[in-house]
Amino acid sequence: MQLVGMVALMVGVLVSVAYLVYMERKVMAFMQLRHGPSVVGPWGLLQPFSDALKLLAKECIIPFKSRGWAFFAAPVITFALALAGWAVIPLGATEVIRDGVVVVMPYVVADLNLGVLYVLAISSLEVYGIIMAGWASGSNYAFLGAIRSVSQMISYEMSMGLVMLSVSLCAGSLRLTDIVVARHAMPYWMDLLLLPMAGVFFVSMLAETNRHPFDLPEAESELVSGYNVEYSSMSFAMFFLGEYANMILVSAMMVVLFLGGWYPPLNIHILYYIPGFVWFCSKVFLLLFCFIWVRSTVPRYRYDQLMRLGWKVFLPFSFVWVMVISGVLLWVKALPGMQN
């Protein structure tokens, strides 16, 4: 049964990636007073599959200076890690009563006790595929793009880790299912306490996924396409799929940490008749729209501004705010372990 769930999750992520690309092109076209994809299929709905077939049919060009196995291993590693992060994301849940106790049964492949640490570890491992791609391509542009991307991801992982720590402190658990349940039962003052961390997490999401306005690794005027400049055909497609799968993954993490997961946004009885999976997907969709909105409206940062924001603003602020949250929880005797 778990194998069926894994296959269904992989297929769902790949289809979601395909139509996220379609959504991005349509929304950006609307904001720029254009039509966007509208030829292949009704309203252009088959355009993602047309693009996939085009990439499959292209020749895989191997640069003369590339470094053999590493050149082909890099996109596979990046794509595999982008899918692996989804194993611990609870997409919904069913509540059952056993011996008079309400038990939450999440829709998740692996409900790990250390789910937060697992997601952080997967996001950290992704830098290996990127630096390998830049080194193995044998191109200075690709290598510089890879160095930029890796330094950017490492810089913002620090603040993201502190944000996740603050939410875990409030929830008293590192399991993502427990965090969603605890966040749903939290008082409003605790939501306000975590609100600045939500802002830090959203901006860090943009930097972690190399998305606009922090897409410095692929600055066209400087580095052409960045670390994947020498890739073509399905090798390029794997990097492309990995990037968009990561966009959906970090959006799902923000839904789990800050937006109540599969619970409805308002505690109104009639809203609970809508399946939790629908609420979860709706919240992820809203965050993905924000990704596209930012890309269409915000100018690109300079590299020094990006690094200054990560190391001199977000990291100190996140550290101080974790201390503030810990102090407040200590004052109200709500730190993990104090309730007993």
UniProtKB/Swiss-Prot annotation:
TM regions (residue ranges): 3-23, 69-89, 102-122, 127-147, 154-174, 186-206, 248-268, 274-294, 312-332
Subunit structure: NDH-1 is composed of 14 different subunits. Subunits NuoA, H, J, K, L, M, N constitute the membrane sector of the complex.
Coiled coil: none
Matching Pfam families: NADHdh (PF00146)
A GO term for molecular function: quinone binding
Alphabetical UniProt keywords: Cell inner membrane, Cell membrane, Membrane, NAD, Quinone, Translocase, Transmembrane, Transmembrane helix, Ubiquinone
Biological source species: Anaplasma phagocytophilum (strain HZ)
Main location: membrane
HAMAP family associated with the record: NDH1_NuoH
The protein's name: NADH-quinone oxidoreductase subunit H
Gene Ontology biological process terms, A to Z: aerobic respiration
Family: Belongs to the complex I subunit 1 family.
Topology of this chain in the membrane: Multi-pass membrane protein
EC number: 7.1.1.-
GO cellular component: plasma membrane
Biological role stated in the UniProt entry: NDH-1 shuttles electrons from NADH, via FMN and iron-sulfur (Fe-S) centers, to quinones in the respiratory chain. The immediate electron acceptor for the enzyme in this species is believed to be ubiquinone. Couples the redox reaction to proton translocation (for every two electrons transferred, four hydrogen ions are translocated across the cytoplasmic membrane), and thus conserves the redox energy in a proton gradient. This subunit may bind ubiquinone.
